[in-house]
């Protein structure tokens, strides 16, 4: 599939009023990487909105034959690694032109992970965060929705940063255990959510 690069699919905010309590944004449509198609998925969209000065809310909407999608069992929720080995929703957030960024993983199991990178796939560490993301999940026969609210104010590299670059992605596991990789923009070659070209959304607040 071609990389998504259309004005109606990529939302760019040029102004943000810190006095506002929320901003609603248009949905961004994710596409499967050409090497990992999944015909059981009809669509996968993400809505990103800002609430208060330092909260980002990610809402992922998957439309699919859920009998053919493996979803991790829901639990108490907590920090966990390797969530991308199964169905998982992801976001990558960078501050302005800085080489470093944060990776956010949200699982339908309610588990989560936040990693800090000093540069492209370098210096990976667990990000220190004062409060876990607030995750909610709803599932039906023909789809799944996951919403996660992240408090950027608890992340030193992103606190009070006016210009953010954001990449959106997801991993969907089918009934046979195969993984398909979904993103807003795919670089050439194999799936790579960390690639700088994937940071297709900009938020100026």
Where do the PLM segments sit?
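Intrinsic low-complexity, disordered N-terminal segments enriched in polar/charged/small residues
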Residues: 3-5
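Beta-strand elements of well-folded, non-transmembrane domains
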Residues: 50-52, 62-66, 95, 110, ...
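Short amphipathic beta-strand and strand-loop transition segments with alternating hydrophobic
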Residues: 44-50, 131-139
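Acidic/polar low-complexity flexible segments
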Residues: 20-25, 80-87, 95-101, 159-205
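Order/disorder boundary and secretion-linked terminal/linker segments
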Residues: 14-73, 82, 185-205
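Localized edge beta-strand/strand-to-loop motifs within extracellular or lumenal beta-rich domains
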Residues: 140-154
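Extracellular/luminal beta-rich ligand-recognition
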Residues: 78-133
């Amino acid at each position: 599939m071609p990389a998504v690069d259309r004005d109606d699919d990529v939302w760019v905010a040029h102004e943000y009023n810190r006095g506002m309590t929320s901003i609603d944004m248009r949905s961004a449509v994710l596409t499967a990487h050409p090497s990992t198609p999944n015909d059981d998925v009809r669509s996968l969209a993400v809505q990103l909105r800002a609430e208060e000065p330092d909260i980002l809310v990610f809402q992922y909407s998957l439309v699919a034959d859920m009998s053919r999608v493996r979803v991790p069992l829901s639990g108490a929720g907590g920090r966990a690694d390797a969530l991308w080995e199964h169905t998982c929703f992801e976001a990558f957030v960078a501050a302005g032109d800085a080489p470093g960024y944060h990776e956010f993983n949200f699982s339908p199991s309610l588990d989560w992970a936040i990693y800090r990178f000093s540069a492209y796939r370098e210096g990976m560490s667990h990000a220190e965060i004062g409060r876990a993301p607030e995750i909610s999940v709803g599932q039906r026969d023909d789809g799944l929705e996951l919403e996660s609210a992240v408090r950027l104010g608890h992340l030193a590299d992103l606190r009070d940063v006016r210009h953010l670059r954001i990449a959106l992605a997801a991993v969907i596991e089918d009934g046979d255990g195969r993984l398909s990789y979904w993103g807003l923009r795919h670089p050439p070659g194999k799936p790579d959510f960390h690639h700088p070209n994937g940071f297709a959304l900009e938020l100026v607040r």
